[in-house]
Amino acid sequence: MLTREEFSAILANGPLILDGATGSNLQKAGMPRGCCTEEWILANPEPLVNLQRAYAKAGSRIVYAPTFQAQPIALQALGLDADTEKLNAKLVSLTRAAAPGCLVAGDITTLATFCDSWD
């Protein structure tokens, strides 16, 4: 992981371009709607690897690891919450291998889960 100073030094060299759409491109590559994206990617890594390589080749210097819902609340519904750390490590490793030389960022999405009322 970069320190704040290391990241600031990278930013001082000019703008950093991030990758683009992942989920919709994975669906175009055959990922079914409504599946666990992270689980599908680990079972079918080639579409993600190809996509991330294409983004890196196009000039992206930061590539998101596909960790959108790889957190305990979302994974609990699938019975995978105990594997949260392992899933994230595999997804980050896959991204690092697909886009060497790029920075890898984690990514998280909103949840359709609500907190209990404090009343």
Where are the model-predicted features located?
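Domain-level signal for soluble alpha/beta catalytic cores
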Residues: 1-119
